[in-house]
C-alpha cells in the first residue's frame, strides 16, 4: 500500500527560475514550482492547511521564450483576459515571467491583488494584457473551475452538454457537487466530459454519475488516490447519465481522472478521445525537510489485473494536439462534437 504523506510548509522562499514539474526531475516536485501548490493543496487533510498563493488560473511549462500556457481555468483572471492554450507569457511588468514569484514577491505569501501587465506571444504576435491575480489555494481554484466550465449548446437538432472536471476530490461535498453538475446536463442528448490537464483522486462514487454498476472497478493494492476517506459518499443517491458521452484526455491528465476515463470508457456509449495519459497514479511524500514532494510510482497497483503506472490510457480515438500547434479552435473538442452527433 502506498501512503500519502501530508506536507505543510510556511514562509517558503522562491527563486526566479521556477517552472512546472515537467522541467524538473520526473520524481520530485520542488517548492519553486507551480505544480507543488497543486499537489500540496489536494493532499492536505483540511482547508486550513492548504497553501494559498496569488495566481491567475493557468498551468504551463517554462521555455526559452517564456512560460508556455498549457491550460487556462474557466472563470479565472487569465481566462477573463483572453489568454489561451499555446500562448507564451514573456514578461510581467517588464520583468521575466514566473507563475509563482511573478505574483508572490514576498517569501511569506500574502494577497497582492493589484493589476499586473503581461506581455504575451501568440504565434508571431506580441501583445499585452492586464490581469489581477486571485489569492486562493489551487484545490479551491480547480473545484471552482469545474462549475464555471458547465455549458450547453445546440448542434444540429441536438443539445450537447460540456463539463470540464479540472479537479477530483474525495470529499462528500465535492462528490455531491459533481452529481449536481451532471444533473444540470441530464436532458442533453450527449455530453463532452473534459478531463484534459485534470488532476485529483478517485472514489468509486465518482463513477455513480456515469455508470449503473459503479462498484465493479477492479483495483488491487490500491494506493491513496482510490481509498475513500469519508463515510457518507456511499449513501449518495445514484442516478447515472445513460446517454452517449465523449471523454477528452491528454498527456497531462493525471491520477484519478485517468482511472475515471479508463473505467467509464469500457461502455459502448462512452468513447475516449485525445492523446494517451501518462499513467501517473502514484503518491507523493515529503522529501525529508526540504520544500519538495517525492513521487512514488504505483508499481504494485493493478487495474483489472493490468499494470497502469507509466502506461496510462490510450484513447479509443487518437487525435493529437501538440502545444506547438496554435489555433483559434479546439480540434479535440470539435472532434468530440462530431463523434457524439454520429451516435446520438
Model region roles, listed by residue range:
Residues 78-101, 191-193, 264-267, 272-273, ...:
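Conserved PDZ fold ligand-binding element
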Residues 51-91, 95-98, 170:
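PDZ/PDZ-like domain segments forming the peptide/carboxylate-binding groove
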Residues 89-93, 163-164, 184-200, 248:
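Short acidic catalytic loops
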Residues 1-8:
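Sec-dependent signal peptide recognition
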Residues 25-71, 130:
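PDZ/PDZ-like peptide-tail recognition elements
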